[in-house]
Amino acid sequence: MGVAVNRMVGYFTSPLSVALTLVVAGLVFLALGRRRGGTWLVLVGTLWLWIFSTGFAYAVLGGRLERMYPPQRVEDLPEADAVVVLGGGVGADTNSLVYAELLRGADRVLHAARIVKAGKAPVVIASGEGEREASLPLLKEFGVPEEAILVENESRNTEENARRVANLLADRPGCRRVLLVTSSWHMRRALLMFRRHAADVEVVPAAIDYEGIVAAESLALPRSLAPSADMLMKNSFMLKEYVGYWGYRILR
């Protein structure tokens, strides 16, 4: 799917967008004198927003995605010809900062470096827009030699990651197996796209970044039912993953 389609999917699967649409529609109905329909729309919109603002929803949605790719020691990973790490965890370096900012999912870069330093792969391919300024300095700081780092610097979404990295791998005929590093909740969709675009290469998941499992293990009522902006943001990511995965499977 293109970038514009991705943004539309993100908007229409956002719990906040859905809730606001329902509430505004309900208020319009009430203004037109349709009290029953308007009241129901406002109630459903409010309930929808509350559900997806809770840690309970995140433990269910995120935990299910993450448990598909359980935590694994680097020592248990197979040897591969390259590590592919998807970007998004490191803020691009700017003139106003001394060091790049670590964002949600920054442990992707650390895990890729960990894999290389364990001798499981000789090369890291960092894929994503701005990765030359973001992940490259951090990989070097984590001890990966610059000559062992390849950067694909133009991808704006996961499908572009898969397509552009597949082109890089096609130029490396000896590359038969890669370890794919991304957040555990993102792995299912990323694997689907990489295995489709790089069909001649064995793509092995090397997941990291487990938050849903931790949330599920620390689940406690009634605290997990209290709404928060952080949970709303995380659940928005999870819903986008589910819709993106099934949309890609159906449409492609």
Where do the model's predicted regions map?
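Membrane-embedded alpha-helical segments of integral membrane proteins
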Residues: M1-L30
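Hydrophobic alpha-helical segments of integral membrane proteins
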Residues: M1-V9, A57, L61-L65, N235, ...
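Extended, histidine- and acidic-residue-enriched regions that form the cofactor-binding/catalytic faces
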Residues: L16-V18, G55, R249-R252
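Membrane-interface helix-boundary motifs at transmembrane edges
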Residues: L30-G38
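Hydrophobic membrane-insertion alpha-helices, especially the h-region
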Residues: W40-G55
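A structural signal for short, hydrophobic/glycine-enriched beta-strand patches
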Residues: I51-L232
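C-terminal capping/extension of enzyme domains
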Residues: L219-R252
